[in-house]
């Protein structure tokens, strides 16, 4: 029984110690003061965007349906990591229970993969809108939009389940100190005393498949969009299509650039200290930038914001 208990303890420790981003107290305070407003901008900006789309009837189109769900994803995405990271920056020793670590990994990985799939769905939506504007609402029916959203969520959940299950079947007898500020896959593989070759292979294969398939879908969609824009006779239509597509491509480039850097590498090239800053970028910074990217160049969103502001702060003006 004692041997059995020892084996179980080696496989499933009660908790992990999160080493965080840095040991220096002054840097941790500086990071807290920097990351707190970034997280609040991410949370309030994304929730505000989703609420704005819900409140304004003019934004009840397939394009804004996907944008609202992307905003909700980003709010959840940053909230899966941000609050605990901020609290841990002010603690002398940060820990996370074993089951909470597994849950955090599942939620974060699932949301990240879901967002990749959703970005591909948004590219297809833009293609249909620009290619066949008169048939746009018919082609992008509510049923199709829900199917694309459901497929994105299912793909993310399956991928996260595989990674989380295989990661937490490993033994962690070497160390319980995770060289990161959250339960990410590479730092956990680094402290396992089991053979992690299958995990590394599946991490590369699944992430590679999802990212390659979605990037291919985005590339093909924008290839057709470029062809349609070139043949447009309306300068205003071309400008609007380029503006909308440019916002989406900016979000795609930031998201995929950091994910490829983080996960599509062999374990021998992992530099966990460098990866921590990349992790901060894609867990907090990117979600905070997406509302700005999609709103600053979008006349419909800016007009909806202006009217909503007038309605709540200048009731007489908003009713005119």
From Swiss-Prot:
Compartments where found: Cell membrane
* Chain ranges passing through the membrane: 30-50, 59-79, 104-124, 144-164, 201-221, 242-262, 276-296
Q: What are the alphabetically sorted keywords of the record?
A: Cell membrane, Disulfide bond, G-protein coupled receptor, Glycoprotein, Membrane, Olfaction, Receptor, Sensory transduction, Transducer, Transmembrane, Transmembrane helix
Query: How the protein sits in the membrane?
Result: Multi-pass membrane protein
Could you tell me which residue ranges are on the Extracellular side of the membrane? Answer: 1-29, 80-103, 165-200, 263-275
Q: Name one GO cellular component term.
A: plasma membrane
Q: Which GO terms describe its molecular function?
A: G protein-coupled receptor activity; odorant binding; olfactory receptor activity
Mainly resides where? Answer: membrane
**Residues on Cytoplasmic side:** 51-58, 125-143, 222-241, 297-320
Q: Check the record and name the InterPro entries matching this protein.
A: GPCR_Rhodpsn, GPCR_Rhodpsn_7TM, Olfact_rcpt
The chain's disulfide connectivity reads: 101-193
Q: Name one Pfam family in it.
A: 7tm_4
| Keyword Membrane set for record | yes
Provide the glycosylation site positions: 5
Report the sequence similarity comment from the record: Belongs to the G-protein coupled receptor 1 family.
Role, per record: Odorant receptor.
Protein's name according to its UniProt entry: Olfactory receptor 5C1
Q: Which organism is it from?
A: Homo sapiens (Human)
Q: What is the lineage of its organism?
A: Eukaryota, Metazoa, Chordata, Craniata, Vertebrata
